[in-house]
A protein has these predicted regions:
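N-terminal Rossmann-like dinucleotide-binding module
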Residues: 3-28, 32
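Rossmann-fold dinucleotide-binding core
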Residues: 14, 139-213
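Short helix-capping segments at alpha-helix termini
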Residues: 24-27, 53-58, 133, 158-159, ...
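NAD(P)-binding Rossmann-fold cofactor-contacting core
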Residues: 27-50
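A structured beta-alpha segment of the ubiquitous adenosine-cofactor-binding alpha/beta core
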Residues: 53-77, 83-86, 103-112, 123-134
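Rossmann-fold NAD(P)-binding glycine/threonine-rich loop
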Residues: 88-158
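Long, compositionally biased stretches enriched for glycine and/or charged residues
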Residues: 185-431
């Protein structure tokens, strides 16, 4: 079996390789293709990946490629973790926000929109090549941020290619809740027996339930979470907000709930998060280039993205082996929440079978959450239209619709700035 990783020169790749090595008995991988446009970086990361695999007795081949069509040919799965414009473009996205007095972030607000405009055409070209060249029914598993928005574009403009979006936030939340329960009870809990009930859009979810072997333990989780917040001098969340909601918000909701605080912290830049990551990556690539290194260094944790390889390889394994496991993914709503539009891509629990991934029927979120979801989904749908058609009016309306976007009198200035700084990666707007 062939699996292709688009953005194979990413510093995350060794973690993914580890995941495949750990599951080789159940997931019989023959060829892992690493595709990247940065040859130098691909050689470093790919060389390290090959040493990792060789150290485990070479259960599969690692093949490096800079040719997209060759890389997706005959693939059973294609995972996407690419970054159009690399880390320099992320830095531009962050400072675009700061320059205009807005949130400057990789996936949220104006930065997330800029990234989506650059990324969507590339992801759709991969889906088209898969339709023509990959194995029949090959699945595209997207990690590229903004993951929900990119998966929304795939669902609308490449519906014939099976696709799903994944993120490490739900599993990180699940593992953190398990740690909390273990601490309280002194008993280690098998993660496979636990299930997190979470719903929303990618980076805009609310965790609202937790079961262990189908027993509801959410009241204990909330009680413990609130007690922790109240004991802290500067808690991450205002305890009253959490007590009223009776849900735990996704970390990224801080940009919406505490916008002023987040804007203030941006004033300290440099370094922005992209600049911090660039330093971490420089160090990681130097370590990866060491011919003696055979397993991922501890510094990889500084890169962020905990549990990334677990999410990816567990999902592929569940799909390949028809396990019927429940995974939290970004997927088209369909009939899972009849009250919400069927064509919305949501982040929600879904059943993973070989025949496909099906969202589990679930109850909708209340108005306080739904209002924000509807607003962000409107922005997402407009951004998809803008990215696919190079439609400046749709891009203008997307900025206007976003609650973290500019006021109406500043939309044009922000849009002009965004399109100008990323002009080489946005040909659809400049024809």
């Amino acid at each position: 079996m062939k699996v292709t990783v688009v953005g194979g020169g990413s510093t995350y790749t060794p973690e993914l390789v580890n995941g495949f090595l750990a599951r080789i008995e159940q997931f019989p991988l023959d060829e892992l293709w690493l595709l990247d446009i940065d040859e130098e970086r691909l050689e470093v990361v790919g060389g390290f990946a090959r040493r990792m695999v060789a150290a485990q007795g070479s259960p599969f081949k690692v093949i490096l490629s800079t040719n997209q069509r060759e890389a997706v040919q005959d693939a059973a799965y294609v995972t996407t973790q690419l970054r159009v414009g690399q880390m320099e473009a992320r830095r531009e996205d962050e400072y675009l926000g700061q320059r205009h007095g807005l949130i400057g972030q990789e996936t949220t607000g104006v930065g997330g929109m800029a990234k989506a405009l650059r990324t969507i055409p590339v992801i759709l070209s991969i889906a088209r090549d898969m339709q023509e060249l990959a194995q029949p029914g090959a699945m595209l598993v997207n990690f590229t941020n903004p993951a929900g928005l990119v998966t929304q574009a795939l669902s609308q403009y490449a519906p014939e290619t099976p696709s799903v979006g994944v993120c490490n936030v739900p599993i990180t939340a699940k593992m953190s809740i398990l740690d909390r329960l273990t601490e309280a009870t002194g008993k280690k809990i098998d993660p496979d027996l636990a299930r997190l009930d979470t719903l929303g859009l990618n980076h805009l979810t609310w965790h609202r339930g937790f079961t262990i072997e189908e027993e509801d333990v959410w009241p204990q989780v909330m009680q413990s979470f609130l007690a922790d917040l109240r004991a802290q001098e500067k808690p991450e969340w205002d305890p009253q907000t959490i007590a009223v909601l009776q849900m735990i918000p996704n970390y990224y909701l801080q940009y919406f709930y505490y916008t002023d605080k987040k804007l203030k912290s941006q004033e300290k830049w440099p370094p922005s998060r992209a600049e911090e990551v660039m330093e971490v990556e420089k160090g990681l690539l130097a370590q990866y280039a060491d011919p003696a290194l055979q397993e991922p260094p501890a510094d990889l944790m500084k890169r962020g993205g905990a549990w990334y390889s677990t999410v990816a390889t567990q999902l592929l394994n569940a799909h390949y082996n028809d396990l019927g496991e429940v995974h939290v993914v970004n997927i088209r709503n369909g009939r899972a929440i009849p009250e919400w539009p069927s064509d919305w891509v949501l982040e929600m629990p879904a059943l993973v079978h070989k025949s496909g991934i099906t969202p589990l029927p679930t109850r909708p979120l209340p108005p306080a959450q739904f209002g924000l979801i509807a607003q962000i989904k409107s922005y997402e749908l407009l951004t998809v239209e803008a990215a696919v058609h190079g439609n400046r009016d749709a891009a203008y309306q997307a900025l206007l619709a976003h609650p973290l976007g500019p006021t109406a009198d500043k939309v044009q200035a922000v849009l002009d700035d965004m399109l100008a700084i990323h002009r080489p990666y946005l040909p659809q707007f400049w024809h």
